[in-house]
Amino acid sequence: MRLSPRAALSSPEIICSRCSQSCNNKELGIRIPRPLGQGPSRFVPEEEILQLASEDANMHSVFADAFTDLGRLDNITLVMVFHPQYLESFLKTQHYLLQMDGPLSPCYQHYIGIMAASRHQCSYLVNLHVNDFIHHGGDQKWLNGLENAPQKLRNLGELNKMLAHRPWLITKEHIKQLLKAGEHSWSLAELIHAIVLLAHYHSLASFTFGCGINPEIHSNGGHTFRPPSVSNYCICDITNGNHGTEGHLPVGIVMPTDSTCEVEALMVKMKQLQEGRDEEEASQEEMATRFEREKTESMVFSTEDEDPPPDIDVSRHFEDTSYGYKDFSRRGMHVPTFRVQDYSWEDHGYSLVNRLYPDVGQLLDEKFHIAYNLTYNTMAMHKDVDTSTLRRAVWNYVHCMFGIRYDDYDYGEINQLLDRSFKVYIKNVVCSPEKTSKRMYDGFWRQFKHSEKVHVNLLLMEARMQGELLYALRAITRYMT
């Protein structure tokens, strides 16, 4: 049984006295772990998360179901508590992918999760699935490196790296190689299950890094045995959830910034765009030109130049460690635009997934719609705000970076609504999440609430997942026809 580090004690004064006596008794030799992180997230104050979780009565049943399912309440779930409607859909989908009988065995499911998370060096997700893989009786030799896994899983490595970094390169030939590999062949149902898992964990790595998720105290990298350096800090504070005094402002306190009119200016632009839609629309040629311009300009907002040093324990789970995201619009490289009017999730991908992996298409569709349409009609301190224009700009910008175009969308809106710091953040979280820093998180939408920034990360995660699925499912459709 794991005791929560957030369980409050009724008599901290008595415990502190006992702690003091125990600490002075060197003969005991007890090593007490101390959490390295302050709460579930490095970016979001712990008090805001815990306060929200305690105020929403419905969250108790959601948490209970999640704990029953997985035997844990992980920090991703705790950060998603800001958006309970989405969280319920997310947990339901993840439960179906991992807990219900499907084309793939539990060992394969969790190993694919390890492979996917490893592409972005997401040790948090890798460690979760290593534990689950072992729990389900997986062969621990596989964990020594991808070369020790069955050939069938190793064959999935090429699709994994393209899906994670350059999904526009996936063709029906890649699908054929997996389906026609002799004794190591995948069935169509197995491949759909694998692709959904890969896309799920690539995008979940984006959310993990985008929200600065901390490892739990019992996980690798989640604790230390060194004494705290903050004065007047007692070991029993660990169980009270008090991890020191530095790091975050009290709940409700907003840092003063130079951008005091940032929110108001954005709201004015949104209103102008919404009111201007009744005016004469641009021609199809002009709309296409604006898309190409936005796609090309997206390369200006480069991800951080410095690659984080590879984690040996993580990188062993995939091949070709140098393979990463590349701007498809760089000079000398041209990839045809993916027109949603020709192949969309609603008209093509949804039915294909549902046919080969029943009910999953419905669950994914519900999750996409909740993330896309989620709104509380608020922006920072303002209420009764229609945020649909802004949400659509964020979603379509992610797809634009992947070369995916909506014919009925004016891409000129993106430049009006998304400033440079926000575009840099989006590109890092979606394309190279392992490079995301607190500086980037703090640097965009400085007057907005943490719950709103978490909402942004939900949009980025789901837009990325749908983009990956569109390319992979289109390749399968082309193979089948």
Curated annotation (Swiss-Prot):
EC top class, as a word: oxidoreductase
**Could you tell me where this protein is found in the cell?**
Nucleus; Cytoplasm
| GO molecular function annotations of the record | L-leucine binding; oxidoreductase activity, acting on peroxide as acceptor
Q: Where is this region: N-terminal domain?
A: 63-244
Kindly state which reaction or reactions the protein catalyses.
a hydroperoxide + L-cysteinyl-[protein] = S-hydroxy-L-cysteinyl-[protein] + an alcohol
- Residue numbers spanned by region C-terminal domain: 310-481
Say where the protein is mainly found.
nucleus
Record GO biological process: cellular response to L-leucine; cellular response to leucine starvation; negative regulation of TORC1 signaling; positive regulation of macroautophagy; regulation of response to reactive oxygen species
What keywords are assigned to this protein?
A: Cytoplasm, Nucleus, Oxidoreductase
UniProt cross-references to SUPFAM superfamilies, sorted A to Z: AhpD-like
Q: Which residues bind L-leucine?
A: 375-378, 387, 452
Region (Disordered) location: 295-316
Active site per UniProt = 122 (cysteine sulfenic acid (-soh) intermediate)
* Enzyme Commission number: 1.11.1.-
Keyword Metal-binding (UniProt): no
The record ties this protein, via Pfam families, to:
PA26
Gene Ontology, cellular component aspect = cytoplasm; nucleus
- Role played: May function as an intracellular leucine sensor that negatively regulates the TORC1 signaling pathway through the GATOR complex. In absence of leucine, binds the GATOR subcomplex GATOR2 and prevents TORC1 signaling. Binding of leucine to SESN2 disrupts its interaction with GATOR2 thereby activating the TORC1 signaling pathway. This stress-inducible metabolic regulator may also play a role in protection against oxidative and genotoxic stresses.
Q: Which family does it belong to?
A: Belongs to the sestrin family.
The Swiss-Prot or TrEMBL note on domains reads: The N-terminal domain may have an alkylhydroperoxide reductase activity. The C-terminal domain mediates interaction with GATOR2 through which it regulates TORC1 signaling.
Its recorded name reads Sestrin-1
State the encoding gene.
sesn1
